From Swiss-Prot:
NDH-1 is composed of 14 different subunits. Subunits NuoA, H, J, K, L, M, N constitute the membrane sector of the complex. GO terms for molecular function: NADH dehydrogenase (ubiquinone) activity; NADH:ubiquinone reductase (non-electrogenic) activity; quinone binding. Belongs to the complex I subunit 3 family. Keywords: Cell inner membrane, Cell membrane, Membrane, NAD, Quinone, Translocase, Transmembrane, Transmembrane helix, Transport, Ubiquinone. It comes from Paraburkholderia xenovorans (strain LB400). The chain crosses the membrane at residues 7-27, 63-83, 88-108. It comes from the Bacteria. InterPro entries: NAD(P)H_OxRDtase_bac/plastid (IPR023043), NADH_UbQ/plastoQ_OxRdtase_su3 (IPR000440), NDAH_ubi_oxred_su3_sf (IPR038430). It is found in: Cell inner membrane. This is NADH-quinone oxidoreductase subunit A.
Length: 119
């Protein structure tokens, strides 16, 4: 395998990273640093802060976010499978049906355990 063909990519990564680090460093060194309480306060659309900026979220929001990511990944696997269905034949079809069955069983388990209830 000829690794010389990948040299431009490596050079691009090195130059890009170096330029980014250099610009951030120059800004940090040359920029004024005069913090005060007003600058350090959290910004809420021009209004005074209503509550503490570090308020706690209910765990159910995180559960819904994780479930969304899981089922979003399922959709990401479904699209290329649908495009290549004629090329992969019955073995690919059966593999995806097993994959979908696992997700449906997981969804049924979450539903039965009350993971989707908000009360």
């Amino acid at each position: 395998m000829n690794l010389a063909a990948y040299f431009p990519v490596l050079l691009f990564l090195i130059v890009g990273t170096g330029l980014g680090v250099a610009l951030v460093s120059i800004g940090k060194i040359l920029g004024p640093n005069k913090p005060d309480t007003e600058k350090n306060a959290p910004y809420e659309c021009g209004f005074e802060a209503f509550e503490d900026a570090r308020m706690k979220f209910d765990v159910r929001y995180y559960l819904v976010a994780i479930l969304f990511i899981i089922f979003d990944l399922e959709t990401a696997f479904l699209f290329p499978w649908g495009v290549a269905l004629r090329d992969i034949g019955w073995p690919g079809f059966m593999a995806m049906m097993i994959f979908l069955l696992e997700f449906l069983l997981g969804f049924a388990y979450i539903w039965k355990k009350g993971g989707l209830d908000w009360e």
